[in-house]
Amino acid sequence: MRHKCLLAMAVVASMAFYSVISTKNVTQVDTVQQENRRLRPRVEPTANELDKQSDVDTKLEADRRLGYPGESGFMLEGELEERGGFPWRTFFLGLFASVIEERGGFPWRTFFLGLFASVIGVSIISACYGIT
C-alpha cells in the first residue's frame, strides 16, 4: 500500500513540475511569435483572397445555423454560452491566462496549478496514512 502511495505522490509531483515548465515554454513561444509578427511587413490581402475568406465565413455561418460544429470539429467560440450553458471555455481561459504574467503581474497560472497539485497531494497523503 505504501508503494502505491509513493507512486501516486511521484506522479502528482511530476505533473505539477511539467505544468510549470510547459507554462514557461508557452510564454516564451508566444513572445517569439509576437516579435515575429511585429518584424514582418504588413501585406494587404488581394481581392481574390478576400473573396475566399468571405466564402469560408459564409459557410461557417451556415454550418453554425444548422447546428454543425464548424471546420475544426469544435463548437464556435461563444456558441455554448449562446445556448444558455455555463461559459466553461471563457472561465478556464480567464483562469489560466498568461497575459497578466507577461506584463509583470501576479503569476496566477502558476499559483492555481500549484494550489491544485497541493490539494491533490494532500488528499493522496491523507488517504495513504488514513488521516481524515
Swiss-Prot record:
The keyword Signal applies. This is Secreted RxLR effector protein BLR08. Residues 36-57 are annotated as: Disordered. It is found in: Secreted; Host endoplasmic reticulum membrane. Residues 1-22 form the signal peptide. One of its GO terms (cellular component) is membrane. It is a single-pass type I membrane protein. Keywords: Glycoprotein, Host endoplasmic reticulum, Host membrane, Membrane, Secreted, Signal, Transmembrane, Transmembrane helix. The chain crosses the membrane at residues 111-131. A motif (RxLR-dEER) lies at residues 37-83. Its main location: secreted.
